[in-house]
Every structure is written in structure tokens, then in C-alpha cells.
Amino acid sequence: MGLQTTKWPSHGAFFLKSWLIISLGLYSQVSKLLACPSVCRCDRNFVYCNERSLTSVPLGIPEGVTVLYLHNNQINNAGFPAELHNVQSVHTVYLYGNQLDEFPMNLPKNVRVLHLQENNIQTISRAALAQLLKLEELHLDDNSISTVGVEDGAFREAISLKLLFLSKNHLSSVPVGLPVDLQELRVDENRIAVISDMAFQNLTSLERLIVDGNLLTNKGIAEGTFSHLTKLKEFSIVRNSLSHPPPDLPGTHLIRLYLQDNQINHIPLTAFSNLRKLERLDISNNQLRMLTQGVFDNLSNLKQLTARNNPWFCDCSIKWVTEWLKYIPSSLNVRGFMCQGPEQVRGMAVRELNMNLLSCPTTTPGLPLFTPAPSTASPTTQPPTLSIPNPSRSYTPPTPTTSKLPTIPDWDGRERVTPPISERIQLSIHFVNDTSIQVSWLSLFTVMAYKLTWVKMGHSLVGGIVQERIVSGEKQHLSLVNLEPRSTYRICLVPLDAFNYRAVEDTICSEATTHASYLNNGSNTASSHEQTTSHSMGSPFLLAGLIGGAVIFVLVVLLSVFCWHMHKKGRYTSQKWKYNRGRRKDDYCEAGTKKDNSILEMTETSFQIVSLNNDQLLKGDFRLQPIYTPNGGINYTDCHIPNNMRYCNSSVPDLEHCHT
């Protein structure tokens, strides 16, 4: 008999292999849980040791952990054990909010992201960064790092560093010797006043540079400092003390340039000439009054330009900006060009200005401002032409004034006489009603805007509260409403013309008196101006009082009718209800002092006493007493009592009565 052998089934081997894999996985998970420090909490690849008042990093950080949270503790520089450096799986460490005063040693060797902000780090050594060859992102914000506290070439030891954040420290200059592969550098909110030409010499990969909130001036920036940043895409130098944009800005890849909150008062023509890829430019909150013509010509890819809060002076030098704003493509968004001077155009948008009306020098050749007047022109100005529909309406013409005609030098050097303002503007007044006046004017030259003022005059012609209205140059009339009847107003028209504007000489005034109120046509004329004014001011209240009085009168009448009707109805009901008669005063007088319930009162004129159920009448005396009512009933002659009125008038009845 031969030996029989059985072959292990293939599915059994597969089952054994799967069971071994699952067992090893469970063992690894259990080992990790058992290896988690007792003061921490472990969750998969994360170890949470934050906010536990630790003074050192706990021992026993297991291998396989990728993120280590140690922030908001009291860890100092002596609290980093040497074995922590050998944990190779950790790539992110959070250590912000601790008590470090130096850059820590013995950090995990393969860490890539390190958060050290909100400590008190003052010094950074080369040896500390030399341990972190794979460090890519370093956050050192909110520390006490100074320029002398950074060892020369310290950051260069971190050869893989891409992002370096040094915001809110005590740096007085940009550290020299930064890693060549650095892509983003933030040194904002420091005390940097100087940037040497060696600071960015080898940073050919830098794409984002933020130097906001420092003490930089144009003298503190070395020539050619930024020319080496060939890959720079965003440059922000906000809140410094620059008087003009930094020169030699790299234009190969620059897309965003922020220059706001400086002291920039002029921009050279070539400042942006190389920035052909620039898409966003911000020059807000500076001291710019004008711009050199053509300064934006090479910004072919510009998408947004912000120029808010600059003292733009809208004279001849800003004409090209107005023209440029009218023809920019729709893809370009421009904001902030608002005139701050001269006074007559303050608050107007530069885009809406009429280029022919901007304040230009009077000596501009080939551009005569006005038609020359003959040399024999009279020096006396003529009053404005006024068209008044009704001659009976009160109107006081302006008093002619004498002034010397201004002369403007012509382009060939000869002087020409400028016509007076009254000859170039005609003013007319139309009375609409007793409280409204329509003022119209006609100008012989183009005016950018007008200012119309009016004031009510008193007995002494001393002006009161002046009201004014600014209207555009295209408008030729304005209605003055809510005026007081029978009042004199002084109306002045000021052309806000940018050509040699003179507030006194270029003002034309006139006086007009409104009609009396139509409500006073049938009454006597007011004795004084104050009475007319008082009546005019009280007319709305008078009308309201009349309406209110009429309503009250109607309500009183209706209430009186209702009360009378109810009283009449109640009296009729009381007469009809016989049991109420005894309650009247007359009945009580005739019946006695008070009604007695033992007295059977009969109201009929005749009656008969009969027995009930054939029973005998009760023996006793019955006394019949007639009651004589004043409104009728039994006559006193029906009884033998001759004088029953005495019974009513006395409190004791008579001795004689009728008996049965």
C-alpha cells in the first residue's frame, strides 16, 4: 500500500497570506497608539500636543507621524530632545506661541513647513538652519529678529527654502545671503530704511516681494536693486516714504505693482515704460497733482488702475488724462481721478471735464480766449439785459459799475481788451407766481458750470442767509421756489469758467421783488414787511386750523342730534311704562312721602270688590283714598273731600276720607 499525500488547497494559502497582512497592519496601528506620548493625543498621522502648558517637546514621538502640533505652550530652546531630530516622517511642525528666544535646534531633519511666529526669537544661527536641508516654508512673523541677530549667510544654509516670512520684526535692512531658490519674501512691518544692491542679487526665482510698512525712501534704495528680480510677478512697497516710484523695475513678468500710501508727487515718464505685462497698478493716497503725458502709454495689458485720494489739480496739464480716459478700452477699469482743485471744479470727475474749459495759461499761442474788442471800447460796463413780462411787477435793476477792462496779451505780444462779463452773459427773470421765480441766462461763450446764489433782502438791504446752486454749463435756466411773497431777493450768477476766473469781476447780480400773496388780494395791505412775512409763514397753519375746526363742528352737531334723539325716545318710553309713574316727583307728592307696599293702588276710574272662590270677605276696615294726578284722572268732585290739594301740600293727611 503506497503512501498517499494531499496537496494544500490554493485558496487556503491565499487566506493565510491575507490574515498575516491584516495582523501586521493591526499590530502597527496598535503600536502607534501605544507609542503616543501620554500628554498628547494621536489621530492617524497627527500628534496634538498643543495648549498643554508644556515646557519641552514630549519624548516618544512615534515614527510615521507627519504633522506635529506644539503651538501655544511654554516650550523654550532647551526643550528639544536630540531624538526628535531623528523622526524622519515629520514634515510639518507648529511651534508658534511659545517662549523661544533663538532659532531652535534638533528639529525633525525632514521638516518642510515650520511655524515659529509669535515667539521672542532674536537670533538665527547658520548651524540651526543647516540641519533643515529640506525646509521649504519658514514662518518667523511677530518675533524680535534684528539685522545684527541674523548670522551672515544663515538663510542660505536652508538650500530648499521657497517661502520666507519675516513680517513684524525689528529688521533695519533686508538680510543678505538669501537662498537662490526663494520664491516669496515678506519683510513688511519692519524698520527697513536701506536696501543694498546685494540684497536681491542672486534671487532670480523670486516671484513675490512685500516690503510694506517700512521707512524706505528713494535715497535708501540702491540703484539697480530690483533689476535682478527677472521673475518678479508682484511687488508691493506700500506705506513708505517714496517721492517717486523705484527705478529699474523688472518688467519681464511683473503683473501687480502697489505704490499706495507713499509721498509720491511725480512719476517720471519712463517709470512704467518696461512694464508691458503689468495688469494692476495702484497709486492711491499719494501727493500727485498732475501726471506726465504718456506715462501710461506702454501699459498695454493694464486691467485696473487706482488713483484715489490724490490732490489732482484740473488745469491744462490734465487734458491728456481726460482724453485718455475717454478712449481707454472697456477691459481697463480706472478709478479715483477726481478733481481737488481749483475750487470751481472740486469734486468733479476728470473723465467728465470739458477739455476746452480747463484752466489753461492765457499766453497759449494760437488759442484766443475771447473775440478782441475795439480799442475804443467804453470802460463802463453795461447792466445785463432783463426780460420782464409784466412792467407792473416790482424790479430793481442793478447799479452800473465802472471798472477797468482786463487785457490779455495776444500770441504776437500785443494786448487785447477782454469784454466785460455783463456783455457776454444776459440775465433774465420771469415771475412764475408769488413764491417762484425762473432765472434764465444766455452766455456768449462756453462755460463749464454756473453758480446761482440768491438771498432775501431786508429793509436795510442787508443780506440774510445765502442760498446757492451749482448747475452744469449746458443748463440755461433755474427755477427758484419756496420764496416769500412781497419780498426782495438779490440774485447773482457766477460763471465757473476756468478761463481767468475772478470771483468778483465775473459775477453778475440783479434784484427782484416777488408779488404779494394771492390770499391778500381782497384784504388790506400789510402794514409792514414783517406782517406779510408772518401771514405767509402762517398760511399753511391757518388752512389746517380751518379744516380742523370744520371737522370738530360737524362732530359736535352729530353728537347733539344723537343725544336729543336718545332723550326724546327715553321720555316717550317712561310715559308708556305705567309702573314708572310712581317714581315721578308729582306722584310721590300726591301719594305721600314714600310708596307703601301695604296700600293697594288702583289706577282705574271704577272698581268692584268681589269675593274670591265664594269666600267671605275678610272683616276689616278698608280705606279708599283717591290720588289726583296733575295730568288727569279722578276729579276732586268725585269725592266729598272739598280740598284735596291741601293733602298734597301738607305732610299729614286730612281727617275725613272715603270709607267702605
From Swiss-Prot:
LRRNT domain segment(s): 36-63
Fibronectin type-III domain location: 419-517
Record topological domains on the Cytoplasmic side: 563-660
Glycosylation sites recorded in the entry for this protein: 202, 298, 433, 521
Residue stretches spanning the membrane: 542-562
GO biological process: axon guidance; basement membrane organization; cell adhesion involved in heart morphogenesis; fibroblast growth factor receptor signaling pathway; heart morphogenesis; positive regulation of synapse assembly; regulation of neuron migration
Disulfide bridge partners, by residue number: 36-42, 40-49, 314-339, 316-360
Cellular component, GO, one term: plasma membrane
Limits of the LRRCT domain: 310-362
Top-level taxonomic group: Eukaryota
Location within or outside the cell: Cell membrane; Endoplasmic reticulum membrane; Cell junction, Focal adhesion; Secreted, Extracellular space, Extracellular matrix
Tissues where this protein is expressed: Expressed in pancreas, skeletal muscle, brain, and heart.
Record keywords, A-Z: Cell adhesion, Cell junction, Cell membrane, Developmental protein, Disulfide bond, Endoplasmic reticulum, Extracellular matrix, Glycoprotein, Leucine-rich repeat, Membrane, Microsome, Repeat, Secreted, Signal, Synapse, Synaptosome, Transmembrane, Transmembrane helix
Main location: membrane
Membrane topology annotation: Single-pass membrane protein
Bias (Low complexity) ranges: 373-409
Function (record text): Functions in cell-cell adhesion, cell migration and axon guidance. Mediates cell-cell adhesion via its interactions with ADGRL3 and probably also other latrophilins that are expressed at the surface of adjacent cells. May play a role in the migration of cortical neurons during brain development via its interaction with UNC5D. Mediates axon growth cone collapse and plays a repulsive role in neuron guidance via its interaction with UNC5D, and possibly also other UNC-5 family members. Plays a role in fibroblast growth factor-mediated signaling cascades.
Assembly behavior: Self-associates (via leucine-rich repeats), giving rise to homooligomers. Interacts with FGFR1. Interacts with FGFR2. Interacts (via extracellular domain) with ADGRL1/LPHN1. Interacts (via extracellular domain) with ADGRL3 (via olfactomedin-like domain). Interacts (via extracellular domain) with UNC5D (via the first Ig-like domain). Can also interact (via extracellular domain) with UNC5B, but with much lower affinity. Interacts (via extracellular domain) with FN1.
Protein known as: Leucine-rich repeat transmembrane protein FLRT2
UniProt source species: Homo sapiens (Human)
